[in-house]
């Protein structure tokens, strides 16, 4: 399959994959060798190849890519000149071909998926292609359970994940030694002696994110361990394999649990923080304006592992979402975690629902273009310090002592999210809000553009995804800049 090939060109923006069974292996990788771009497997007497972008099978004109795919077809079919067909949701042409081409839009019934696995086991070959992140973006469906290719490939020990692949320069490279990049092999080594290469560790963590089946294998290795979540004092470094596996599995598993069974994550009491159980949880009535763009602050905080209840009392909740937490950056790609790598959660709203997360966070609502004004009650939360420059009724000297660990200062053009410790002794929040409003308006004046209708957001975080600060919504920076001096 790889004779005379050491790299292939980058076509489009491919996704990433995971591989974990003994008979499966990575074929092509990008910068991150733990997340292949193409994988293959032997299954019974047959073979299966998958690549995370359809451009490689859609009339490739590049000479190297064309040669590579020709050799892939020969390897998969085990024929020099294979007869090739297109996979459809039936078995009509299977006996007449050596190889079936499977595009991402061909969704198979469970009956045909079972028959396809048997056909491969008896000596058939399949080449599958999909852009997994693009498929999720277009369909809004679950990659692991709703994409037919992924359901079949899970039986072979490999699946698509949801990340983008980055090349090495303008190419992807042939995968390194399979023992390093096969998550199953790496997991067995971890189980035996607690060690693993950096590539292998990354492969295990990514496969655990991608595959519920593989996650069960990881749980059998780390479930008996009592582990602290990552904190500034006890970071989870790349060498801390078992800790990072625990974090990866916990971060995936909690989402499938009933709300009543969700517990706080170890370390969440440190960041983003919690509030003593003796402090009363409150209920608030809110009126939400659908014309307001972006996250709508509530001045409320959900503690880690506790349950928030929402009841819509007026209006249609369709098109509205509820967000828990402002620390939106994910850290899976970082070599060291000083907080949990993914701690915010967004859910679509219904007329009545409960929400809990292991980390909690400030509570926000967000409208869409199709949503309408609604009224609701929210309970199970604590109050957070919130200054709003347009709310003349705020008693700031009382507000700043609200018990939640995170606070917000809201101007017309900028909203700051900072630790509550940064505002406990702040006497003039209006001066802060006006200063940052001026920063935004002056920036827009200099650029010759209008001030955006949606206020910018600035969030201080324990650890961010890139650099010391980065742009986006919200703008992210280190928590040290919000630490009071003196």
Go through the PLM ranges and name each one.
Residues 362-364, 368-412, 422:
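Exposed low-complexity, polar/acidic, P/S/T/G-rich flexible segments that act as propeptides
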Residues 33, 54-58, 105-108, 132-136, ...:
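Solvent-exposed loop/turn segments at secondary-structure junctions
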Residues 165, 171-265, 406-424, 431-443:
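Activation corresponds to long, low-complexity, non-globular regions
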Residues 258-386:
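Beta-strand-enriched, solvent-exposed domains that form extended recognition/catalytic surfaces
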């Amino acid at each position: 399959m790889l004779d005379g090939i050491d790299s292939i060109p980058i076509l489009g923006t491919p996704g990433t994959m995971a591989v974990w069974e003994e008979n499966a292996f990575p074929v092509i990788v990008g910068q991150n060798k733990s997340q292949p771009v193409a994988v293959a497997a032997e299954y019974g007497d047959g073979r299966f190849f998958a690549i995370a972008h359809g451009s490689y099978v859609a009339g490739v004109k590049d000479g190297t890519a064309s040669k590579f795919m020709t050799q892939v077809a020969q390897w998969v079919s085990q024929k020099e000149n294979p007869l090739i067909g297109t996979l459809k949701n039936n078995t009509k042409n299977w006996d007449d071909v050596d190889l079936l081409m499977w595009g991402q839009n061909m969704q198979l019934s469970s009956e045909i998926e079972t028959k396809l696995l048997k056909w491969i086991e008896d000596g058939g070959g399949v080449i599958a292609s999909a852009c997994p992140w693009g498929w999720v973006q277009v369909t809004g469906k679950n990659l692991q359970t709703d994409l037919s290719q992924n359901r079949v490939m899970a039986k072979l020990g490999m699946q698509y994940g949801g990340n983008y692949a980055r090349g090495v320069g303008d190419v992807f490279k042939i995968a390194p030694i399979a023992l390093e990049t096969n998550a199953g092999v790496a997991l067995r080594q971890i189980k035996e002696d607690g060690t693993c290469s950096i590539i292998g560790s990354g492969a295990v963590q990514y496969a655990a994110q991608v595959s519920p089946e593989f996650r069960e294998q990881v749980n059998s290795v780390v479930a008996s361990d009592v582990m602290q979540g990552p904190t500034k004092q006890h970071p989870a470094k790349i060498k801390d394999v078992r800790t990072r596996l625990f974090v990866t599995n916990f971060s995936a598993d909690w989402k499938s649990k009933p709300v009543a069974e969700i517990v706080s994550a170890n370390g969440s009491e440190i960041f983003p923080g919690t509030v003593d159980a003796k402090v009363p949880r409150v209920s608030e009535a809110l009126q939400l304006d659908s014309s307001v763009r972006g996250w709508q602050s509530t001045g409320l905080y959900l503690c880690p592992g506790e349950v928030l209840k929402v009841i819509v009392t007026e209006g249609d909740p369709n098109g509205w979402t509820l967000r828990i937490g402002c620390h939106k950056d994910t850290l899976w790609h970082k070599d060291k975690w000083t907080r949990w790598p993914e701690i915010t959660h967004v859910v679509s709203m219904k007329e009545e629902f409960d929400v809990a997360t292991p980390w909690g966070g400030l509570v926000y609502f967000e409208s869409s273009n199709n949503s309408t004004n609604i009224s609701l009650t929210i309970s199970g939360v604590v109050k957070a310090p919130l200054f709003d420059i347009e709310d003349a009724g705020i008693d700031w000297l009382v507000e700043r002592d609200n018990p939640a660990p995170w606070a917000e200062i809201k101007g017309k053009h900028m909203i700051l999210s900072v630790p509550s410790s940064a505002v406990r002794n702040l006497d003039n929040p209006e001066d802060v809000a006006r200063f940052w409003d001026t920063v935004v308006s002056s920036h827009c004046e200099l650029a010759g553009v209008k001030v955006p209708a949606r206020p910018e957001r600035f969030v201080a975080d324990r650890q961010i995804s890139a650099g010391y600060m980065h742009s986006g919504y919200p703008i992210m920076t280190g928590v040290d800049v919000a630490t009071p001096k003196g």
